[in-house]
Amino acid sequence: MNDLTKILFDYFKDNDIDPNKVATLIEDAKINVLDEMFGEEGEWVLKKLGSVESFDKEKIFHSIAQTSDSAGAKMNTSDVNIIVEDVLKKMKSIKRNVYPTKEIRRYVEEALEEEGYKKVLETYKNN
């Protein structure tokens, strides 16, 4: 067990913190530490496997466009851009620079629902 893990383990054990709460605290700490490390250097995505990459809104655009095609509910460029802008607004409201992929996916789902793209939303959730 490394030093940091031991410190955290002892703290959680000594304070009788529920394992589910531990998982949430560790996930939040990971995001907050990375956010501090990157500071104001743009926006970053924390991938599922732990890597960090520069945020690219074009990836969201292409994901939504491909999903709409797969759903048989083709969205035009303007429609997709509206969803992307909704996602960016949600990200900016958080006031940090590192976003886990699952959080960005949730924002896309919320934007699709809010804008009335139910069929695209269902397909997006299943991808």
Please report, for each region that a protein language model flagged, where it lies by residue.
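Long, C-terminal-biased catalytic regions of enzyme "large/alpha" subunits
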Residues: 1-127
